[in-house]
Design a protein with these regions (language model features):
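Conserved RecA-like ASCE P-loop NTPase motor core of nucleic-acid helicases/translocases
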Residues: 1-2, 398-400, 475-486, 603-604
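Conserved RecA-like P-loop NTPase helicase motor core
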Residues: 441, 446, 450-456, 509-608
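SF2 helicase catalytic motif II
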Residues: 148-168, 172
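Conserved interdomain hinge at the start of the Helicase C-terminal
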Residues: 449-481
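Residues immediately C-terminal
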Residues: 135, 159-162, 166, 405, ...
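A substrate-engagement module of RecA-like helicase motors
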Residues: 3-126, 182-256
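Conserved helicase motor "Helicase C" RecA-like lobe of SF1/SF2 P-loop NTPases
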Residues: 483-508
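A contiguous, basic/glycine-rich beta-loop/short-helix subdomain that forms a polymer-engagement track
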Residues: 93-123, 136, 141-143, 302, ...
Length: 610
């Protein structure tokens, strides 16, 4: 949600701070997650034969760009958003640090590293602009406690709950398990690339410290029981290998057996509650837990040995070597915590449910193709860990948003906003303040509710969108609650509009990142843009380019297992109504971005409770 907001803040901050201080440092720094930045070691590997064919051309173009880039940000930065779409899907991702494989000071590019430069610059800055998830991940896993910010402002504060929800989640899935295997064992023999297992990364330590070497060997041997390449194919053919693949196979079978959609949701993931489990599945879960425990113990032992090597350092251990071992220790700690969370999740399968958590099985699918199977756990109230990890150590935290409070007939509902801020968990009474909007919505906006388009009538829905776009002469933002309907409407009307000189762009159809799509939309007043949730929040298109927002239906929350649990805890239909009101307010907020803006807000719903 926040890429557009980060660009906006970077532009606005230029009015308050100079580009650089007298000593050359930047007072304002944009900081993103590691997976957004170009990794120079991955680029070097790609240039030296890691990428072949068309992908090698991408590597050459990225190398040219890297020489001139402001900060090396490949996702939503100054790399053209369309470039990656001309090459294979994973091309851009393969050049970033997606998998926690960084060797820190052991890297020959450490001093020039874009990620490290951003981290060093943010330590000196007055203002660090980052997204919610990065702030939480750094608080939970940051290497240097002294560098953590003490005063935090969460803009778009209504997203903090969702960001905390995903940050403090646990998921034991096939994809996560195979990543752990690759981190410990290294890549499969036939794969290219510079990925190394533990043995290669810590070869010098293993040869110097016998106990450390034995721990590395034990961890690698135990990790061979994790899923390997081709695991999904083996499960689909009924031939799983190893304790975890056996477990995922049983999870998949049970999830399909309990699927209540009757094949209606063939293109989407399916899930089932963890209740009344067959004895065989519980037995498989215990075997999988033993396999995970066999990996965790040598990793803990290895962490202790690395600490001992640092304390009683040998003569050959220079500065970069010490930093590399520090980095390895940090990465080990993260994996040990992950394994402990997975073991706790598996122990729960045979026992009573924990009222603080919501657990479920899921088979993830995209366009009817399975891509992951696993066991998921979320906090019922994710603000509890958020309060402990982020709020408690901070000196001051501010949450700001136009939709923090729910608007009811009695006025603003501060009680719910305070609950969702996490403040009650640290027993602090927060200060609250509200400001009136500077815009005259009554005079500048008109709301239309269209009730004669039946739900599921795609030809009528597409016809309505085409008529609205033609009547407005472009400048329409269309928001959908389902990707399938978005694609169907786009397919029916794009040609018709193009013939009228009205270009139409769509998320999930045009292979361009959302930030670039919004830039194209902003620059062409005849263009229209169709999108989903990500466009409902944080998109800033002032002026003539956005004159009409069309909502394809009431934005009901999806009735997932997690949503049902929170709905039961949060007051039933009141909980749903609160979510819908906030989503409508956010969607309406896209329309009026300045005092001269005006336009229409249209909802297409036969059952809209107006």
């Amino acid at each position: 949600f926040t890429k557009n907001l980060q660009r906006q803040l970077r532009g606005e901050s230029a009015r308050a701070w100079p580009e650089r201080r007298e000593d050359g440092t930047r007072p304002v720094v944009v900081r993103k997650g590691r997976e957004n930045y170009l990794c120079l070691l991955n680029l070097e590997d790609a240039m030296q034969g890691g990428f072949g064919g068309r992908a090698a051309i991408l590597a050459q173009m990225v190398a040219r760009w890297a020489a001139y880039s402001r900060d090396g940000d490949m996702i939503g930065g100054d790399l053209p958003g369309w470039l990656g779409t001309l090459f294979r899907k994973r091309g851009i991702a393969a050049l970033t640090d997606q998998r926690g494989e960084c060797v820190y000071a052991g890297c020959p590019h450490y001093r020039k590293c874009f990620i490290e430069r951003a981290a060093r610059a943010s330590a000196q800055a007055d203002l660090v602009i980052a997204n919610h998830a990065l702030v939480m991940v750094n608080a939970a896993r940051g290497r240097d406690a002294a560098q953590r910010p003490t005063r935090i402002v969460f803009d778009e504060g209504h997203h903090v709950f969702d960001a905390a929800d995903s940050t403090f989640a646990a998921a034991l899935t096939g994809q996560e398990a195979i990543e752990l295997r690759r981190w410990i064992v290294g890549p499969e023999r036939k794969s290219k690339g510079r990925r190394r297992g533990l043995a290669a990364r810590l070869a010098d330590v293993a040869s110097y410290d016998e106990a450390g070497g034995e721990a590395v060997e034990a961890a690698i041997e135990a990790a061979r029981h994790l899923p390997s390449d081709g695991w999904l194919g083996r499960i689909n053919e009924g031939e799983p290998y190893g304790p975890l693949e056996n477990l995922f196979s049983a999870v998949r079978a049970l999830t399909f057996a309990r699927d209540e959609s009757g094949g209606q949701e063939a293109g989407y993931g399916i899930e089932t509650e963890i209740a009344d489990l067959p004895g065989q599945l519980i037995e498989l879960a215990q075997q999988a837990a033993s396999a995970l425990s066999a990996i965790r113990h040598p990793l803990v032992k290895l962490g202790v040995r690395l600490e001992a090597v640092l304390e009683d350092a040998p003569d050959w251990l220079d500065g970069p070597g010490r930093a590399r071992i520090e980095g390895a220790r940090h990465s080990l700690g993260w994996r040990v915590d992950l394994l402990a969370a997975w073991e706790a999740l598996l122990e729960r399968l045979g026992g009573p449910a924990d009222p603080e958590f919501v657990d479920w099985f899921a088979v993830d699918r995209s366009d009817a193709r399975e891509f992951d199977i696993g066991i998921h756990r979320r906090w019922l109230d994710p603000m509890k860990p958020f309060a402990k990890v982020v709020l408690e150590p901070a000196h001051g935290v501010m949450l700001t948003s136009a939709t923090l409070t729910d608007r009811t007939d009695e006025g603003a509902d501060w009680e719910d906003a305070i609950t969702r801020s996490g403040a009650p968990h640290i027993e602090v009474a927060p200060l609250t303040t509200a400001a009136e909007s500077p815009f005259d919505y009554t005079a500048r906006a008109e709301v239309l509710i269209v009730t004669d388009i039946k739900r599921g009538d795609l030809p009528a829905l597409a016809g309505a969108y085409a008529r609205f776009i033609e009547a407005a002469g472009g400048g329409v933002l269309g928001l959908f609650t389902a990707i399938r309907r978005l694609r169907a409407v786009y397919g029916r009307i794009a040609d018709r509009l193009a013939r009228s000189g009205l270009p139409l762009y769509a998320q999930h159809v045009d292979p361009i990142d959302t930030g670039t799509l919004v830039d194209i939309f902003r620059d062409d007043r005849t263009a229209s843009l169709l999108g989903t949730d990500a466009l409902r929040d944080g998109v800033d298109v002032p002026g003539e380019s956005l004159r009409c927002v069309v909502l394809e239906g009431v934005p009901w929350p999806r009735p997932t297992i997690l949503h049902r649990a929170r709905r039961a805890a949060g007051g039933g239909s009141r909980h749903d109504d609160r979510i819908i009101r906030a989503r409508l307010a956010q969607a309406f907020g896209r329309l009026i971005r300045g005092k001269d803006d005006k336009g229409h807000f249209i909802v297409l719903s036969p059952a809209f409770p107006s």
